[in-house]
UniProtKB/Swiss-Prot annotation:
Annotated cofactor note: Binds 1 zinc ion per subunit.
SMART domains listed in its UniProt record: Fapy_DNA_glyco (SM00898), H2TH (SM01232)
Record-level GO BP terms: base-excision repair
Subunit and partners: Monomer.
Keyword Disulfide bond: no
Zinc finger residue extent: FPG-type: 245-281
Active-site residues, record numbering mapped to chain: P2, E3, K58, R271
Described purpose of this protein according to its UniProt entry: Involved in base excision repair of DNA damaged by oxidation or by mutagenic agents. Acts as a DNA glycosylase that recognizes and removes damaged bases. Has a preference for oxidized purines, such as 7,8-dihydro-8-oxoguanine (8-oxoG). Has AP (apurinic/apyrimidinic) lyase activity and introduces nicks in the DNA strand. Cleaves the DNA backbone by beta-delta elimination to generate a single-strand break at the site of the removed base with both 3'- and 5'-phosphates.
Family: Belongs to the FPG family.
The organism's taxonomic lineage, starting at the top: Bacteria, Pseudomonadati, Pseudomonadota, Alphaproteobacteria, Rhodobacterales
Reactions the enzyme catalyzes: Hydrolysis of DNA containing ring-opened 7-methylguanine residues, releasing 2,6-diamino-4-hydroxy-5-(N-methyl)formamidopyrimidine; 2'-deoxyribonucleotide-(2'-deoxyribose 5'-phosphate)-2'-deoxyribonucleotide-DNA = a 3'-end 2'-deoxyribonucleotide-(2,3-dehydro-2,3-deoxyribose 5'-phosphate)-DNA + a 5'-end 5'-phospho-2'-deoxyribonucleoside-DNA + H(+)
Protein name: Formamidopyrimidine-DNA glycosylase
Species this chain originates from: Paracoccus denitrificans (strain Pd 1222)
UniProt binding sites for DNA: H100, R119, R160
Keywords (A to Z) from UniProt: DNA damage, DNA repair, DNA-binding, Glycosidase, Hydrolase, Lyase, Metal-binding, Multifunctional enzyme, Zinc, Zinc-finger
Amino acid sequence: MPELPEVETVRRGLQPHLEGRVIARAEARRPDLRWPLPPDLVQVLTGARVVALRRRSKYILAELEDRGSLLLHLGMSGRMLIEGESQGDFHRDPAILPRHDHVVLWNDQGTRITFNDARRFGMVDLVPPGAEHPLLAHLGPEPLSDAFTAEALAAAFAGRRMPVKAALLDQRIVAGLGNIYVSEALYRAGIDPRRLAGAVTAPEVAALVGHVRAVLEEAIAAGGSSLRDHRQATGELGYFQHSFRVYGREGAPCPTPGCTGTVQRIVQSGRSSFFCPLCQQ
C-alpha cells in the first residue's frame, strides 16, 4: 500500500493539472468499488474549480470551490494517470488495463486524469462543504509538519506498552507512516522495533523525529518506492527502493560501517519488520 512519500509524489504530479483548473468533464465508469462511489460524483465534479490540492496522511484532497472536497485513497493498487497533449507522447503501461479505469476527469485544458485500480481497494469520495470526513477526524500530526515534535511524540509514547514500531504505525499518533519508512527510520535511530514505546528515552525520541523526517524527505525526492504498483502520476517509477538500508534486505550485512550484524526479519502484528539486532537496541 502506498505510504506518505508515494502519495505525496502522486499529489505533486497531479497538482499542475488540477490545482486552479476547472473539471470540464467527469465520468464514473465503475461505481461498485469496495468503497462505492457517491451517486452524485459526476454532478458535483463537472464544472467544479479545484482551488487546492493537498495531502492528509495517505489521502489526497482536492478542495473544490463552493462544492466541498474530493477525497482519494489509492488503496493497494490504485494509480493516477495523466494523459493529454500537454504531456507529449504518453505510453500506457501494458499492465494497466483500461477496464480498471474507474473515475476519469478532463480539465479545461483537455488533459485527462484517470483513477485506475485493478484490485478496487481504493476510494473516491465527496466531503460536503465545511465538513470533515470521518476517516480524517482522528489522525495525528503530519510527520513533516511543525506539529511533529520530540515533545509531542514523547507525550504520545508515554506509558504505552506496545512496540515502538506499532506506535509509529498508529495513525492517531502520527499520520501517514507505513511499514517501509518506519523500519528505515528506526534503523537510522538505532532503536529496536520490539522496544516498548514507553521505554524509548527522550534523547532517542528526539533523534527518531529527525530520522523520520529525513527518510520521508529523501523518499519524496526520489519519487517514492516502487516495489509493486506505485508509479508517479507521469508513469515513472519511484527510486527510493534502491536506497533501503534494512527494509527487504533480510540476510544482508548491516550497512553501518564497522558493524558485523546481519539484517533480520521478524513479523509484528502480521507485518514484516527488518532491523539489525546489533545496531538497534
